[in-house]
Curated annotation (Swiss-Prot):
Keyword set includes Nuclease: no
Keywords: Antibiotic resistance, GTP-binding, Nucleotide-binding, Protein biosynthesis
Record's function text: Abolishes the inhibitory effect of tetracyclin on protein synthesis by a non-covalent modification of the ribosomes.
Name recorded for this polypeptide: Tetracycline resistance protein TetQ
Domain tr-type G: from-to ranges: 1-244
Gene, per the UniProt record: tetQ
Length: 641
């Protein structure tokens, strides 16, 4: 049996989960069709998902149709959970991108499609909610061609709420023949030579073009009234093809971890090549760690079943492997989809329990959530001792707060969300702290040179000290101290885009230890950074704004107020397209503003595009009155020289 892994993607409220539930019901995987409104869906299984009607975590289920097993991954539709969506992309053989016939293309739709297109993932576009009043399909078709791709093939016509095929194995309209000829040279040559080309020939060519992500079929339906669902199932099993197996050697990718109500850790793996068997002993990540598979499940027709073996391209579930982390692999390193640029969160806020004695409980709960979602990073501020969580947005914060209260029984308070800034030294400086020169309490001399690098270069560490003089353990201790120091600069933000060179060292053989060097390094680094001064860097977004031409003046005024850098403006009689960069801090709510002043016609699409020196104010991430006493003594001694 062929097996495919299919992602279901959509902007929020396009009906993604409803479509998935109908696929399960139509294929016979469930006895009744779950409804989001009723809170009885299979894929949105978390209480918070059912209550709020949104998908928070990617969920996997399975159906069989036309002799093909299709593992369906229902992904979040909200931008705050983009990291979950990005992990899903790595394991897909194809995707269904769902649009709402009424709301049309949203910013999230365009972002998702551009990623699918970039990664060359075969994609079917499904226009849902065709039953809604006021639907204008002709305008939507134009929007699809303008904002998504010209290479779309509308496979059906809609008449009085019903769908009818216009292209199949046995019949194809003349204009569709021309479309295929324009996309395939072999068919074009046969067409120009007046050779006989059957509808099946055209159909098979369309299948090949979709598999290469050169053409995107468009279908219609209504999940609410089960319209077009069987046709969508037929299209999925026709156009989305399983990958060819390249090896019999086991290669598996861990894409999801969850904990059941009893606390058992459940790990979901996609078997890329080979097979995973019960009682196998397998290696993790080419390391020296081995695990034994003591239990093994897969997903079949919407439910989990115990099995002895899971084969290539299928989903395996194992329990209680504590060493597992998302992104791990078993056996050979898998060849996954490349080209994803992971988006790091650019917001953060402090969190504290309502009852101070429950702080350790909060930390334990956050650690569990981090295991399930590595994009949820949290830390303890070294100056304020506060717990800080990095976030993608307000909705994610609300979900985390609800999970802490309902799943872990701990109530917390979140402070105001802050933008995550960064720091970069302004000029090249050198700083030395000598051994046995007060107030230095460590048996070490360290000299460091700091110099700024171009934006986006990150941290570079070099050493001018030979390993013949100072061995690896001592120098590694200095490097560790540098990395630790970069976590918090003069204003409490990460220090980046700099080169740090270890330039001078002295030690006393009988008493000096690597710990002396590790502990002294942050003081040398801090004094050097103070001498250099820092630029504050703020996160930037690359944006594309599409608006009706009549709204262009307001849009440009808004962008100027947000201190954006406009790179290109192109307008015709109806539309204006504006591209550029804008600070995250000034544009957080602009997508909803665009939707409001254009009455739903405008699209404001953004993606992270690095950091630049801020032109606006910023907030510190440090309580400036809390000073390290030894640092104060170093500063005082340096000022006396």
């Amino acid at each position: 049996m062929n097996i495919i892994n299919l992602g279901i993607l959509a902007h929020i409220d396009a009906g993604k989960t409803s479509v998935t539930e109908n696929l399960l019901f139509a294929s016979g995987a469930t006895e009744k069709c779950g409804r989001v409104d009723n809170g009885d869906t299979i894929t949105d299984s978390m209480d918070i998902e059912k209550r709020r009607g949104i998908t928070v975590r990617a969920s996997t289920t399975s159906i069989i149709w036309n002799g093909v097993k299709c593992n369906i991954i229902d992904t979040p539709g909200h931008m705050d959970f983009i990291a979950e969506v990005e992990r899903t992309f790595k394991m897909l053989d194809g995707a269904v991108l769902i649009l709402s016939a009424k709301e049309g293309i949203q910013a999230q739709t365009k972002l998702l499609f551009s990623t699918l297109q970039k990664l060359q993932i075969p994609t079917i576009i499904f226009i849902n909610k065709i039953d809604r009043a006021g639907v204008n399909l002709e305008r939507l078709y134009m929007d699809i061609k303008t904002n998504l791709s010209q290479d779309v093939l509308f496979m059906q016509t809609v008449v009085d709420g019903s769908v009818y095929p216009v292209c199949s194995q046995t019949y194809i309209k003349e204009e569709y023949k021309e479309f295929v000829c324009n996309h395939d040279d072999d068919i074009l040559e046969r067409y120009l030579a007046d050779s006989e080309i059957s509808p099946a020939d055209y159909w098979n060519t369309i299948i090949a073009l979709v598999a290469k992500a050169k053409v995107y079929p468009v279908l219609h339906g209504s999940a609410m009234f089960n319209i077009g669902i069987n046709e969508l199932l037929d299209a999925i099993t026709s156009f989305i093809l399983p990958p060819a197996s390249v090896s019999n050697r086991l290669s598996a990718y861990l894409y999801k971890i969850e904990h059941d109500p009893k606390g058992h850790k459940r790990s979901f793996l996609k078997i890329i090549d080979g097979s995973l068997r019960l009682r196998d002993v397998v290696r993790i990540n080419d390391s020296e760690k081995f695990i034994k598979i003591k239990n093994l499940k897969t997903i079949y027709q919407g439910r989990e079943i115990n099995v002895d073996e899971v084969g290539a391209n299928d989903i395996a579930i194992v329990e209680d492997i504590e060493d597992f982390r998302i992104g791990d692999y078993l056996g050979a390193k898998p060849c996954l989809i490349q080209g994803l640029s992971h988006q790091h969160p650019a917001l953060k806020c402090s969190v504290r329990p309502n009852k101070p004695e429950e702080r350790s409980k909060v930390i334990s709960a956050l650690n569990t959530l981090w295991i399930e979602d590595p994009s949820l990073s949290f830390s303890i501020n070294s100056y304020s001792d506060e717990l800080e969580i990095s976030l993608y947005g307000l909705t994610q914060k609300e979900i985390i707060q609800t999970l802490l209260e309902e799943r872990f029984s701990v109530k917390v308070h979140f402070d105001e969300i802050k933008t995550i800034y960064k720091e970069r030294p302004i000029k090249k400086v050198n700083k030395i702290i000598q051994i046995e020169v007060p107030p230095n309490p460590y048996w070490a001399t360290i000299g460091l040179t700091l110099e700024p690098l171009p934006l986006g270069a990150g941290l570079q560490i070099e050493s001018d000290i030979s390993y013949g003089y100072l061995n690896h353990s001592f120098q590694n201790a200095v490097f560790e101290g540098i990395r630790m120091s970069c976590q918090s600069g003069l204003h409490g933000w990460e220090v980046t885009d700099l080169k740090v060179t270890f330039t001078q060292a002295e030690y006393y053989s009988p008493v000096s230890t690597p710990a002396d060097f590790r502990q002294l390094t942050p003081y040398v680094f801090r004094l050097a950074l103070q001498q250099s001064g820092v630029d504050i860097l703020e996160p930037m977004l690359c944006f594309e704004l599409q608006i009706p031409q009549v709204a262009s003046s307001k849009a440009i005024t808004d962008l100027q107020k947000m201190m954006s850098e406009i790179e290109d403006i192109s307008c015709n009689n109806e539309w204006c397209h504006i591209k550029g960069k804008v600070p995250l801090n000034t544009s957080k709510d602009y997508a909803s503003e665009v939707s409001s002043y254009t009455k739903g016609l405008g699209i404001f699409m953004v993606k992270p595009c690095g950091y630049q020196i801020t032109k606006d104010g910023y907030s510190d991430n440090i309580r400036m009155n809390e000073k390290d006493k030894l640092l104060f003594m170093f500063q005082k001694s340096m000022s006396l020289k």
